[in-house]
């Protein structure tokens, strides 16, 4: 893969190199829901299963659909390299409530909360239809709300409120409490970004 000085391609190339040296058995010991058949890892992201070849990287969707964009593929590589299987204790956290949340809150607000508000709060019906198409669980909160499984054991909720003449649209994203120790803060930002992009792709 020829790499240009690009904000998406350079991180991907970095993790692709690390991925080549990955020990599959070590991955299985950390991520028991991930499968390995001697040639490919199989893992689930937002209800879809993907096969990732190792050591020479290649990705395919088991449903025959499109493969995810490069930032999502980078996230999956980081998950295979560093992911942890941590039990969810049944609590929900905002991004700000988790470690380092205050430090990352400005980029998070722009990339996730504001984007979700104006993408979904202005098209609530489309948001509901796309979320249900993805198999999300409907929630009784907000003008519309759904719960998703990002990767096994890690859940996210998006709640949206429609705007009106007086108030702009609004959104909140909640994370299962195991994100606190299971993902670095920058990966929590990316997780929100991936969730919004995936829902929007199902409009």
Question: For each predicted feature, which ranges?
Answer:
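Charge-rich alpha-helical segments
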Residues: 1-18, 38, 56, 65, ...
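Conserved binding-pocket/active-site segment within a compact domain
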Residues: 122-181
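Ampiphathic alpha-helical segments that act as solvent-exposed interaction surfaces
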Residues: 67-89, 176-203
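Short Lys/Arg-enriched alpha/beta "domain-start" segment
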Residues: 1-39, 72, 79-134
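Domain-length accessory/inserted modules outside core catalytic folds
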Residues: 104-108, 112, 116, 141-142, ...
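Short, charged/polar micro-motifs that form catalytic or ligand-binding hotspots
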Residues: 62, 66, 117, 144, ...
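Amphipathic, interaction-prone secondary-structure segments
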Residues: 27-55, 137-162
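Intrinsically disordered, low-complexity regulatory segments enriched in Ser/Thr/Pro
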Residues: 48-74, 161-186
């Amino acid at each position: 893969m020829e790499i240009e000085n690009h904000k998406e391609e350079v991180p991907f190339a970095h993790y692709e190199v690390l991925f080549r040296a990955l020990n599959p058995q070590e991955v299985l010991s950390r991520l028991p829901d991930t499968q390995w058949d001697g040639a490919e890892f199989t893992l689930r992201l937002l209800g879809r299963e993907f096969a990732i070849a190792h050591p020479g990287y290649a990705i395919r969707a088991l449903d025959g659909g499109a493969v995810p964009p490069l930032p999502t593929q980078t996230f999956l590589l980081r998950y295979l390299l560093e992911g942890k299987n941590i039990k969810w204790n049944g609590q929900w956290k905002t991004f700000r409530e988790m470690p380092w949340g205050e430090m990352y809150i400005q980029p998070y607000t722009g990339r996730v909360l504001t984007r979700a508000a104006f993408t979904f709060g202005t098209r609530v019906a489309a948001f509901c239809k796309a979320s249900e198409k993805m198999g999300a669980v409907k929630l009784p909160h907000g003008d519309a709300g759904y719960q998703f499984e990002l990767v096994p054991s890690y859940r996210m909720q998006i709640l949206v409120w429609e705007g009106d003449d007086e108030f702009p649209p609004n959104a909140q994203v909640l994370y299962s409490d195991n994100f606190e120790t299971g993902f670095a803060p920058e990966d929590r930002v990316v997780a929100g970004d991936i969730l919004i992009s995936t829902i929007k792709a199902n409009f």
